[in-house]
């Protein structure tokens, strides 16, 4: 059974978040075509503690001793997922802090990556792709640094493909918001169909 990890950083919640609408369109399309997929929904508003130096040392100790502390859950989820879907609004050229906190806990030596003998980082995640869904009040204009970061981090974890669907310009006066969201939703649904129908033959 395929495991789909949905990291929900739609901090305004389902009622107000425009990013949430894109996420739902993607997930509905994907699970319709791939009904055997097990969706793990992580609401990142239920925030983890900030990873301080002391907590990082504790985490390294848990891993070294083979302990299963709940705060290792983010790393284990990323490592065991077959598909990672991230929903986050475009804030300050990036994404909300709750997502960064989760990702810092995910970056765990021995779980999501390791070092080879020559010092290279080797990813340990089995995920075949990462999907980033976002919405922005203005134009992104090539400054989608949140996606750039996620793509690089995913590669470090061994995730070979990354895709982004963005609804842009939603707060610009005169914008037909519903039309923009509908077009972005169509792109999200098309990507979901691609990933559901060609799980082992991705191009990206």
Tell me what each language-model feature is.
Residues 22-26, 146, 184:
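Hydrophobic alpha-helical membrane-association signature
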Residues 10-11, 90, 136-138, 168:
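Residue-level signal for short, function-critical loop segments
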Residues 13, 48, 139, 171-173:
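Flexible, glycine-rich phosphate/dinucleotide-binding loops
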Residues 6, 86, 130-132, 164:
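Structural beta-sheet core signal
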Residues 147-204:
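Glycine-rich phosphate/pyrophosphate-binding loop and the adjoining helix
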Residues 116-159:
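Short, glycine-/small-residue-rich phosphate/pyrophosphate-handling segment
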Residues 1-88, 93-104, 108, 189-204:
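N-terminal beta1-alpha1-beta2 submodule of the flavodoxin-like/Rossmannoid cofactor-binding fold
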Residues 15-18, 142-144, 175-179:
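Short, solvent-exposed loop/turn segments at secondary-structure boundaries
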């Amino acid at each position: 059974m395929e495991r789909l990890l949905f990291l929900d950083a739609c901090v305004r919640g389902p009622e107000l978040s425009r990013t949430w609408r894109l996420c739902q369109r993607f997930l509905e399309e994907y699970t319709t075509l791939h009904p055997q997929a097990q969706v793990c929904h992580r609401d990142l508003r239920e925030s983890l503690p900030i990873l301080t130096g002391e907590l990082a040392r504790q985490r390294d100790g848990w891993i070294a001793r083979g302990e299963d502390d709940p705060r290792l859950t983010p790393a284990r989820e990323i490592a065991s997922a077959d598909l990672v879907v991230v929903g986050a609004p475009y804030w300050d050229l990036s994404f909300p802090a709750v997502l960064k906190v989760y990702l810092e806990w995910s970056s765990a030596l021995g779980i999501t990556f390791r070092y080879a003998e020559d010092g290279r980082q080797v990813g340990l995640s089995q995920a075949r792709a990462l999907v980033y869904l976002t919405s922005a009040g203005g134009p992104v204009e090539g400054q989608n640094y949140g996606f750039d970061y996620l793509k690089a981090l995913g590669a470090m974890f061994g995730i070979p493909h990354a895709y982004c669907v963005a609804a842009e310009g939603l707060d610009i006066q005169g914008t037909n918001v519903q039309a923009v969201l509908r077009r972005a939703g169509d792109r999200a649904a098309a990507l979901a169909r691609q990933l559901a129908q060609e799980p082992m033959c991705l191009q990206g």
